[in-house]
Amino acid sequence: XKESSFDIVSKVDLSEVANAIN
């Protein structure tokens, strides 16, 4: 699915945002 791809993208985006904040 497509849901799997979206989940991966969401996790990556959150990771990048968290890194930027930290």
Swiss-Prot record:
SUPFAM superfamilies: YajQ-like. InterPro entries: YajQ-like_sf. This is 23 kDa basic protein. It comes from Geobacillus stearothermophilus. The lineage of its organism: Bacteria, Bacillati, Bacillota, Bacilli, Bacillales.
